[in-house]
């Protein structure tokens, strides 16, 4: 009935899988002995603990899930079976009714966001097509009112999401129930209901989409998007170039050939239509999020974490819906490639451990290609190659290979996948390698969310007040470089922690990316999704989950719908009016529900 390798795997007992052997990476000292003076110096340094030991505490093992079943489930496909998706008859009617109301409240918020965006969204500078939408001409004349409607909608969307937390097993107090009361399919349908209205409206919270459209047109016309900015290449009369934010209008594209080839395809298909291009880019973003959602649930099963809680934090998150779908950022495509590649890579390592070499190499090759494609959207995607590589090296070592051989072979496999992917895509698309030298353009922005930027600006300010002159630019170079160096060192530490088994590859990737975002020269609210989305499928401590809820709730309101700065008085009136309107609607809704407590839908 089973193949010989599978029968051998099934004979492995639980104790044999749990007990580490003497040759395991974590049980052998494999670093060369340092010279005595160096050892004496190292002894004087503060102890920072074993690599990954603190980060690993974000994950709590579920004692009800036997480790011995893991390889069998993965190899036979049993881990893909989920009774909660096929049978919701055991769910409590009261909780189903409550969830249905929350879904409806969130959908109402999404509809308000979509309607308000017709006047408050990131509209094109010329030939605005959204005035022809129902209500668009009317809303476009009222920037402040439209912005209030969007923010009120964000309020209801966020409120519904936050109140769903206990229903997915994330209580607001430590003694609460950690078991999900709703099924994964219910959460997926909720995601569809919340995203559908936003798919059809104007861009939100950023003008970046016009850079994507312009760069796609540049690439489709056979020009090099790395040779100049959209304004230079398309000309000042081009309707796409005129809508690109001034700061990026003369900047080369920082994105890789995968992002540019997608944008070029959309340019050809839509004939540079703004409405068609926005919708097509949104569809691409949605496909990326859907792929990431599939991978999140697979990784959650692998890590023995609640799939419902993982999907709730990583996909249903309003920060993701508002900025990756509403704002149409390339991070959605990046995360789709990255997480699917991560799951396939770990499937390959599982099969190496069980001796299924043929399927293993197929999965590993696909993983390398997909993660390389993630890096060819934005270079931060390449980080995934390192963590899959260390998981692969760990699997090689478990088969009896020496440490140097295991790490060396795994590294060569990942480098080969990267090089082959870059060469093949460059040849097929005809896009140059300018993305390699085109990084760093975003560093011209002084982002208030960036710790290293803030330190540099404060240092320059102190220097000016001390009469030392304005050295802010020089200090920014120093502080930002120091931040990247620290993040790189921490990433190397997490890579070796992954190899030694102190932290799961998913956790190592998420924690390393979190530190990178904290120390990055430029940080936007949605950048934290680089870490939140992978960590959602591994980190199950209540502290982490509530932290994600708090961060996502707060930063869902930090960017105005138009994505541009407005006068202080205007900003105050928008937020004050939105808060007042939200409070009134909330009180009216609460009063209505109190009068009709049994009314509900599902």
Curated annotation (Swiss-Prot):
- Main location, first listed in the record: membrane
Name the enzyme's class. Answer: transferase
**Disrupted-gene phenotype:** Cells lacking this gene are unable to synthesize lipoglycans (LM-A, LM-B and lipoarabinomannan (LAM)).
Where in or outside the cell it occurs: the entry states: Membrane
Transmembrane parts of this sequence: 105-125, 148-168, 190-210, 244-264, 274-294, 320-340, 368-388, 404-424, 448-468, 472-492, 503-523, 546-566, 571-591
Gene Ontology MF terms in the entry = glycosyltransferase activity
Protein name (Swiss-Prot/TrEMBL): Alpha-(1->6)-mannopyranosyltransferase B
């Amino acid at each position: 009935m089973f193949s010989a390798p599978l029968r051998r795997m099934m004979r492995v007992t639980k104790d044999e899988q749990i007990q580490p052997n003497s040759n395991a990476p974590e049980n052998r000292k494999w670093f060369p002995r340092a010279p005595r003076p160096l050892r004496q110096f190292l002894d004087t340094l503060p102890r920072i603990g074993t690599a990954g030991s603190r980060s690993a505490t974000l994950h709590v093992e579920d004692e009800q899930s036997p480790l011995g079943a893991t390889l069998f489930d993965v190899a036979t496909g049993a881990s893909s079976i989920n009774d909660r998706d096929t049978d919701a008859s055991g769910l409590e009617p009261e909780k189903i009714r409550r969830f249905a109301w929350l879904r409806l409240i969130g959908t109402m918020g999404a509809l308000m966001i979509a309607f308000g965006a017709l006047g408050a969204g990131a509209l094109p500078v010329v030939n605005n097509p959204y005035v022809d939408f129902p209500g668009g001409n009317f809303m476009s004349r009222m920037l402040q009112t439209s912005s209030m409607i969007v923010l009120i909608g964000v309020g209801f969307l966020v409120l519904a999401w936050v109140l769903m937390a206990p229903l997915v097993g994330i209580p607001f107090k430590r003694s609460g129930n950690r078991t999900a009361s709703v099924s994964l399919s219910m959460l997926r349908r909720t995601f569809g209901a919340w995203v559908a209205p936003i798919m059809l409206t104007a861009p939100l919270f950023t003008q970046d989409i016009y850079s994507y459209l312009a760069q796609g047109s540049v690439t489709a016309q056979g020009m090099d998007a790395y040779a100049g900015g959209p304004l230079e290449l398309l000309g000042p009369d081009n309707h796409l170039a005129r809508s690109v934010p001034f700061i990026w209008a003369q900047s080369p594209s920082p994105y890789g050939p995968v992002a540019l080839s997608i944008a070029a395809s959309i340019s050809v298909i839509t004939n540079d239509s703004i409405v068609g291009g926005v919708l097509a880019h949104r569809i691409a973003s949605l496909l990326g999020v859907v792929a990431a959602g599939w991978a999140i649930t697979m990784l959650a099963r692998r890590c023995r974490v609640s799939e419902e809680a993982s999907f709730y934090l990583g996909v249903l998150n309003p920060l993701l819906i508002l900025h990756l779908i509403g704002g149409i950022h390339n991070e959605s495509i990046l995360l789709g490639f990255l997480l699917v590649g991560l799951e396939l890579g770990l499937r390959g390592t599982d099969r190496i451990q069980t001796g299924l070499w043929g399927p293993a190499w197929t999965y590993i090759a696909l993983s390398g290609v997909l993660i390389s494609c993630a890096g060819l959207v934005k270079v931060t995607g390449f980080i995934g190659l390192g963590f899959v590589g260390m998981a692969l090296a760990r699997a090689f070592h478990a088969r009896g290979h020496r440490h140097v051989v295991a790490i060396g072979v795994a590294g060569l496999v990942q480098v080969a996948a990267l090089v082959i992917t870059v060469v093949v895509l460059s040849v097929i698309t005809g896009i140059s390698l300018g993305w390699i030298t085109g990084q760093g353009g975003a560093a011209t922005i002084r982002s208030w969310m960036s710790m290293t930027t803030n330190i540099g600006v404060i240092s320059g300010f102190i220097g000016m007040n001390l009469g030392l002159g304005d050295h802010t630019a020089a200090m920014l170079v120093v502080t930002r470089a120091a931040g990247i160096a620290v993040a790189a060192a921490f990433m190397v530490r997490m890579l070796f922690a992954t190899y030694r088994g102190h932290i799961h590859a998913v956790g190592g990737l998420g924690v390393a990316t979190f530190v990178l975002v904290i120390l990055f020269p430029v940080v936007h609210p949605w950048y934290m999704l680089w870490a939140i989305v992978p960590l959602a499928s591994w980190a199950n401590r209540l502290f982490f989950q509530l932290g994600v809820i708090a961060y996502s709730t707060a930063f869902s309101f930090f960017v105005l719908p138009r994505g541009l700065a407005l006068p202080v008085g205007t900003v105050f009136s928008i937020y004050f009016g939105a808060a007042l309107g939200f409070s009134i609607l909330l009180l009216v809704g609460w009063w209505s529900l109190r009068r009709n407590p049994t009314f509900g839908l599902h």
